[in-house]
A protein has these predicted regions:
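Basic, flexible linker segments flanking DNA-binding modules
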Residues: 1-91, 193, 249-258
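Residue-level detector of intrinsically disordered/flexible regions characterized by low predicted structural confidence
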Residues: 4-5, 30, 64, 197, ...
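Short, charged/polar low-complexity linear motifs in solvent-exposed/disordered segments
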Residues: 6, 11, 69, 78-79, ...
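Short secondary-structure junction motifs
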Residues: 24, 157-159, 238
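Sparse recognition of residues in long alpha-helices and their boundaries
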Residues: 30, 45, 65, 141, ...
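RNase H-like DDE/DDD metal-dependent nuclease/strand-transfer catalytic core used by mobile genetic elements
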Residues: 38-46, 51-60, 72-78, 82-228, ...
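C-terminal domain-tail junction helix/linker
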Residues: 180-184, 206-275
Length: 275
């Protein structure tokens, strides 16, 4: 009976979390499970937990990253990369932005795309601005930026950098004007290497290929509703290996370097070079 109760509790927990985050991996599931059931009689160990995921076909296949949605073939002003030697030490030091696409299926079986613009705090990994638009027009990236800016309206922020690719949306006069008006320094990648905007690319992938995994949308309204739910879960409940398994909201209370659950060779190099 005790084993049966533990199995039932474990399966119900996985089902509940996966209803909010269909693509969350086994390690994060295990850590969330341990936090919730660690002192309960229904608690099972890590190996048993992984065996349950495998037996009941609850493991997740890795997905490929989405194609880029950047058009940098324009003649608007571009800006140097200010992040190459930057070490993150506090919130609102660096924001990163990017765009990804989401498929909408039409009744006749054809499909169109809508586009999700995200602004993320690079230190906390919190999504602080987002907008879903039916085109790649700059008005949607502007709306995401305005959401992020409202967060800092009552704060005294100095030296905040906004980093993006060189897409026309981020180089547009309206977008740059908002950055300038709020004392935010524009920074852009210097080539097409996704690693130059890696945090933004990673967050795109988490939202699209993990939190929205397996969802089939028939309207942009459905996408907007699902994205709002996904962002709330991502910010408030999903632990991050890059944040020592804190959530982004929890990381917002931190100062100084946050321990990662892997080796960051970039940060290791910069710490030595700047010592």
């Amino acid at each position: 009976p005790k084993k049966s109760a533990a199995l039932t509790a474990t399966l119900e927990f996985v089902k509940r979390v996966r209803s909010k985050d269909p693509g969350i991996g086994g390690m994060k599931l295990w850590l969330m499970y341990r936090n919730e059931f660690g002192t309960s009689q229904a608690f099972v160990g890590r190996d048993c937990f992984c065996a349950i995921l495998s037996k009941y076909k609850l493991t997740i296949r890795k997905r490929f990253r989405a194609p880029r949605t950047t058009d940098s073939s324009h003649h608007l002003p571009q800006y140097p990369d200010l992040t190459r030697t930057l070490l993150l030490e506090h919130p609102d030091q660096l924001w990163v932005s990017d765009i990804t696409y989401i498929t909408i299926w039409l009744p006749d079986g054809s499909y169109v795309f809508c586009y999700l613009s995200l602004v993320t705090d690079a230190y906390t990994k919190e999504i602080i601005g987002y907008c879903v638009g039916d085109t790649l027009g700059s008005c949607y990236t502007v709306e995401a930026l305005e959401m992020a800016v409202r967060r800092i309206a009552a704060k005294e922020i100095k030296g905040l950098i906004h980093h993006s690719d060189r897409g026309v949306q981020y180089a547009s006069a309206d977008y740059i004007a908002i950055l300038r008006h709020n004392g935010i320094l524009p920074s852009m990648t210097e080539d097409g290497n996704p690693k130059d905007n890696a945090i933004a690319e990673r967050v795109n992938g988490i939202i699209k290929n993990e939190l929205l995994q397996g969802m089939r949308f028939s309207s942009i309204q459905e996408v907007r509703k699902a994205v709002a739910t996904a962002v709330h879960f991502y910010n408030n409940e999903r632990p991050h290996m890059s944040l020592d398994m804190l959530t982004p909201v929890q990381a917002g209370e931190m100062q100084g370097p946050i321990r990662k659950r892997w080796i960051s060779y970039r940060e290791k190099y910069l710490n030595v070079a700047l010592a």
